[in-house]
Amino acid sequence: NERKQFKTPISDFGAIKVKLAKMATDTYAGESATYRAAKNIEDRIAMREAAGNTHQEAELKGVEEYAIECSILKVAVSEDVQNCADEGIQIFGGMGFSEETPMESAWRDARIARIYEGTNEINRMLSVGMLVKKAMKGHVDLLGPATAVANELMGIPSFETPDYSELFSEEKAMIAKLKKVFLMVAGSAVQKFGPDLEQHQQLLIAAADILIEIYMAESAILRTEKNVKRTSEKEQSAQIAM
């Protein structure tokens, strides 16, 4: 509220509100996905320890089983942080590019996150590549659902009007459609290129972007649903809006 234009705090302008809302939404989605993956890993470690593995063995296997989710989070969260820092500079205006303001160091610190711990390009390709390898080894059924989606597209579409009266029903329907898109892309790619798929980096990166959007959006919805049941829709109104 310190910066003003036409005697009005810039935080009152719609263009600035959109930027702040996008930052808050991306942060919430990233936080939700991180909590989700961390809980899944924690549960898997406990399950393996109960099965007789040492703690070290359980940790290694537990994290390994959720390596895809970890790659997704590394890409999504590092890019969200970068976008927040970038928009922060935009909000500060010319001052934001100066070392005297906090945004200059925030942007520089955020930028390196897309490079270390495996570049985001590598992590994108890894996320889809690992999923495809699991499918080819029979650990995950990818081709079955992909074939079902292809058959569905060849069939007669439903002309019924969906009921979106239930909370998040429309958002869940959108995620379900995104999953079908991913299955079509990934399934077709596996059928066409097989083991050589890893050579087609552009395709892997494009498929990874779909996978990332699915995981982040679904995580935010799952968290909000849980909190609505724990409290109320009124108390979670901001999170629902996100």
Regions found by a protein language model. Name each.
Residues N1-M242:
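Flavin-dependent oxidoreductase catalytic core characteristic
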